Amino acid sequence: MQTSSKTGNEHEKAQQQRDVEEQETRRDDVSLGPGEILQLEHTDAVLDAKMHLVNNAIDQIGFTSYHWQLFVLNGFGYAVDSLILLIQSIVAAQAALEFHPGYPNGLTIAAYVGMLVGALFWGMTADIVGRKIAFNVSLVVCSVFAIGAGASPRWEVLGLFICLSSFGAGGNLVLDTAVFLEFLPSKRQNMLTLMAAWWGIGQLIAGFLAWGFLPNFSCQDPAFFPDAAPCTKANNQGWRYVWYTSGSLVFVMSILRITVIQLKETPKFLVGEGRDAECVETLQFIADKYKRQCSLTLEKMQACGTTDTRALQGKSKWGLGSVWAHCKGLYSTRRMGISTTLIWLSWTLIGLAYPLFNVFLPAYLSSRGAAFGQPSQYMTWRNYTLANFSGIWGPVLAGWMCGTRLGRKYTMAMGALVTMVFFFAYTQVRTADQNVAFTCVINFCLNIYYGTLYAYTPEVLPSAHRGTGNGIAIGWNRIMGIVSAVIATVADTGTAVPIYICAALYVLMAGIAVVFPFEPYGRRSS
């Protein structure tokens, strides 16, 4: 009897212990834990709990070849954004010799207007209809109009096609970071910064295309060659070949995006939409395909409660009220509001400082006696390619720095300050070799800041409003690009004042980076 009673007590204690462990496991499943960036903001307890489960599942699955495919295919978007923006600036001078436009900076403004509208359109619709559609469609739109730009019969038509091509490309910086981040395990989040290396690859491609076509298939500028033949379509095909080739390359990239990965909607977008079953199905699909564990179930998601989608979308998902609701969501708490404002300010400042520097520097150096001579087109585009190649490695270093205790904030601050130092030093350039060297170093240092800002922005934005917040941020950047083009047309470019203003802006950007409210290092994005 005593043995039987003792055995019964042991079974009872064992059952009680199992019950306690089960309760603790359930509590851990639905609690926020210490890892989420926005965990202390308490904007939506149900959504926060579900997001914690999704992050746990993504971390449990780990990094797979699926993520490498995402890294490359999303990187295409980065490359295309920089490719289209640079191609228009590269071909503008040769196209102007053929068309004799009344407003030489018109192509720059057309490109930035297209990029602005694209960033806002693709970013905001990504929060409404999802990331998948824009991921599959945007590059197709870009490629079609890029090819059309090469066949333009007039300056105005060229500007229109550049604007439409830029519209397709303009949403990629918004979408690519969001798509990659929302599938990415937390231990690999610094790869989001590394992905900005694709921006440099796009610049490098632009340099190679210019180097290959323009020296061999372009008319000569009468300003430097008085005996040059009149510039016509027949003897000035180089800039058209650049557009045809770049458009075709983007089209191939768009087909690869659609066929290689057949992207499923991101799990974090699905959670925000209240589509828990689809979220679980997506993560289980990835786990099964790559033979990984995934303990997330629909029951665990439903145990957290029901997501209030009306609070995230407004009264109507398809009206302006939805856009307003997503904008309000970025200011749900005081710290989130400060973070959003500082991010937008940073994008505004860098959007003005970098193009303004490039606009004023050549005239400033010329007025101070810098003697570069008139290099051949071959040497011009060789140097351009070298500078763009240097820009690839800034995000590589930044990706490593972000994975250390420096974190994102101090990586940005250091990148901005070092860039400022070399900007000041660049004003003392006097020879062609110095010009090439400093251009390469500045491209490298600038992309440390730029690449980290690209990654930091989506990391600290809530997933339900990520596209809207990121789109508006990049939109401010594009507005400043338009402003810089206008300034270049009407301002006196012989003064040193703009150079020092640009340097001061980089100091301000470094200060803003340090006081950002959130540091993603060691934490998980929502």
Named regions from a protein language model:
Residues 117-156:
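Conserved MFS/SLC helix-loop-helix module at the cytosolic interface between two early adjacent transmembrane helices
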Residues 109-112, 124, 162, 166, ...:
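C-terminal transmembrane bundle
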Residues 150-161, 215-219, 427-438:
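Helix-loop junctions at membrane interfaces in 12-TM secondary transporters
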Residues 37-69, 228-237, 246, 284-359, ...:
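Flexible cytoplasmic loops linking transmembrane helices in multi-pass membrane transporters
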Residues 195, 212-313, 503-526:
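Central mid-sequence intracellular linker of multi-pass
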